[in-house]
Amino acid sequence: MIETFGNALAEGLVDDKRTKATRAFPPELRRAGRRKLLYLHDASELKDLKAPPGNRLERLKGTWKGFHSIRINDQWRVVFRWAGGNAFDVQIVDYH
């Protein structure tokens, strides 16, 4: 379950709201981004995010150490911290 958000884009998409942040996000990715956020919200264990394989669940390194991600596409990711069966600091970021 998503406990906290790290940016307005992720919060706006999961709530299906039209905000400044969601309007700036590529329109062709809004549905996929929301779907990935809902997968994250429904997950009770980190391993739940391994399916579908297109999620490409990863543990991040470097400045993102302590975070995991699932992919929306090659450029955009849902990034989050996982603890106690919940997701924290959930963000959608341009990873490149």
Which stretches of residues belong to each language-model region?
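A short, surface-exposed loop/turn module that caps and links secondary-structure elements
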Residues: S44-H68
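Conserved phosphate-interacting/catalytic interface
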Residues: L40
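Residue-level signal for pocket-adjacent positions within structured domains
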Residues: A8-L9, K20, S44, P52-N55, ...
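Enriched for short, Lys/Arg-rich terminal
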Residues: L60-K61, F67-H96
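Arg/Lys-rich, positively charged N-terminal/basic patches that mediate binding to nucleic acids
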Residues: M1-L37
